[in-house]
Amino acid sequence: MYIDDTIAAIATAPGEAGIGIVRISGEKAIELIDKIFKSKDHKVLSQYKSRRITYGHIIDPKTEKVVDEVLVSYMKGPNTYTREDIVEINCHGGMIPVKNILELVLRVGARMAEPGEFTKRAFLNGRIDLAQAEAIMDLISAKTEKGFDVALSQLEGSLSKKVAKVREKLLDMLAHVEVSIDFAEDDVDEVALDYLLNKSLEVEGDIQKLLDTADTGKIIREGLSTVIVGKPNVGKSSLLNALVRESRAIVTDVPGTTRDIIEEHLNIKGIPLRLIDTAGIRDTEDIVEKIGVERSKELFNLADLIIVMLDASRELTEEDLRIIELIENKRALVIINKTDLQQKLNLTPIQEIIQDKKIIKVSLIEEIGLEEIEDALAEMVYKGGAKAKDSLLVTNVRHKNALERALDSIIDGTKAIEQKLPLDFVEVDIKNSWKALGEITGDTVEEDIIDHIFKNFCIGK
């Protein structure tokens, strides 16, 4: 990438809209816009002060034809998104005007921006670190208010500041180690070793606290793949419709009605769920239904959360028990439906298999128990880990991997101190931990990883 050239891209989503925006960033931004913009006073933009919006027209310099009526804003660096000069052209929405203006900007000397290049320049120019850059993408793709809040907190530097504090502790440890190595002819005194050991254990705790939020953070960021399973006609489709609050699945008294997979995205108490209603699991000779059953089993194995539906009005069968046995080691919730009918289901064998799983009795037709289901789902996600109110969550798999490597290294360092191994060994472990943490903020990350991260951004951001 050439950081000294000027880039341009459409910054708004494609399609019809009230406004479309073409963004330009670089040292020649004002020079390029002067070639194609004329204000109502027949002035070029460089004649106006920075940080104001100017009304006028984009003019094709070859034909002198008006391309569109626009509002243009000019922001002089370094106090801009990229820390470079930025020009934004607000034109009429729709593909034709924004496409024509972008083509004109490129024709007079700008280069088409790569995906995420504006944000990448903000990172390379030191306005934000890598964790903050990734938070911008999370803000755009947030599925819930909680996801948005966590991403905004990360953009404001909550994670970066915490990581920086831990790295400072590691640097302090390195300084003590290097001083001791410089005076290697003297034995390292117990006071110095005690100090290093206490610091090392403190860093372990700091990193572990961050890692403890990672499972919840991943769910907040990416959503929870939730599969509803059970025999045919137990109420799986009714549950999907009740949670979505509209009729998405066909509900009949005929077993095997749902033959395909029905998927809905919804937000339950701040948790983004990808809720999947599957074909009823049973032995069948129907070819189409059989395919649906096989797909149900595949999704069952891949799901983050399983909701098992049972019918309170029917006796427990071997088929039910086989399904229950499958969830023994999974995050799962058991729902007993049709409690408004005569009860025939014996819960004792179920409770013996899944002693730690929550069982909720509901009547979906009477709309009884739905709130309890939603509360149970939220409790299962947040149980034992980060709470919904927490803003500092590790949501990114890349960050989690870096933290795990940092923790492994400092644990090795702690062991080396306890065993009174040569301090050169301790130094290597501390440095490895420090470097791993630096990957989160981009201080010690490889260039190809940076390129990969920004390729996932949209063009114009």
Swiss-Prot record:
(6S)-5-formyl-5,6,7,8-tetrahydrofolate binds at R23, E88, R127, K461. GO terms for cellular component: cytosol. PROSITE patterns: G_TRME. This is tRNA modification GTPase MnmE. The keyword Nucleus does not apply. Residues 223-382 form the TrmE-type G domain. The gene is mnmE. GO terms for biological process: tRNA methylation; tRNA wobble uridine modification. PANTHER family: TRNA MODIFICATION GTPASE GTPBP3, TRNA MODIFICATION GTPASE GTPBP3, MITOCHONDRIAL.
